[in-house]
A protein has these predicted regions:
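Start-of-helix register in tetratricopeptide repeats
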Residues: 31, 94, 127-128, 165
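Terminal, low-structured helical/coil segments at or just beyond the last alpha-helical repeat
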Residues: 172-216
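N-terminal leader/linker segments that initiate helical-solenoid repeat arrays
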Residues: 18-76, 80
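Canonical tetratricopeptide repeat
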Residues: 98, 131, 169, 203-206
Length: 216
């Protein structure tokens, strides 16, 4: 079974959206390498006694240099496994997105953005573009990030139907683009889940803080 290691409400929906869009089955060996990469990262995080919630990556700020070096080794090992996954499924966007996500786990945001852009070249999905925007913003490329967010919102706006994951990603893209009032109207009209609605409305007050809660 494929797994995508993402935390936080919008990112969980990003993962769900990507899985829904899968239109071809990857090689079984790719699936196995991917699962090994995720298991390796999860095992490290569990040993590090960091809970897998929206505060997980923010805890990286207080880690010692030793812990950061260990984290780099873990990220590098995960990337090697995902390189093997891509060897057997080179046209499958999912593994490019996985590499981006696991680079982000180690706060390597330029690499994360680069690999998410590669995923976009394989399949043009708003979920992937949202991820690219977030990683670009964390890398300090705010203008490029906002261009991605506006494009994401336009893509969702033109869809005839939106899944629950689509609606949350749509609202989050508007939040990150700074369109506070439009984001609030979209949340009011599209988000029915009480918890998701509450979290997203809170995020409209400070988009950068919301992003920093997901990534250090």
């Amino acid at each position: 079974m494929k797994k995508l290691l993402l935390w936080g409400l919008p990112l969980l929906c990003l993962a769900a959206g990507c899985r829904e869009q899968t239109d071809e089955t990857p090689d079984e060996r790719s699936i196995a390498y991917n699962d090994r990469a995720i298991a390796l990262m999860q095992d490290y995080l569990e040993r590090d006694e960091v809970l897998p919630d929206s505060s997980l990556l923010a805890a990286c700020r207080t880690r010692t240099d030793t812990i950061q070096r260990v984290m780099k080794d873990i990220v590098d090992s995960c990337q090697t496994l995902l390189d093997s996954a891509l060897l057997y499924s080179p046209e499958h966007y999912f593994y490019y997105a996985q590499k981006a996500t696991l680079y982000a786990c180690g706060a390597y945001y330029q690499e994360a953005a680069r690999w998410m852009e590669k995923a976009l070249k394989k399949k043009d999905l708003p979920e992937l573009r949202l991820g690219a925007g977030m990683f670009l913003q964390k890398a300090g490329e705010e203008q490029q990030a906002h261009t991605r967010y506006r494009h994401v919102a336009d893509q969702y706006r033109t869809r005839d139907t939106l899944s629950s994951a689509d609606r949350i990603n749509y609202a989050f893209a508007l939040i990150l683009s700074g369109e506070k009032e439009m984001a609030r109207r979209t949340i009011d009209s599209l988000i029915t889940d009480t918890l998701a609605r509450k979290q997203l409305l809170q995020m409209t007050e400070n988009p950068q803080e919301a992003l920093n809660a997901l990534f250090p």
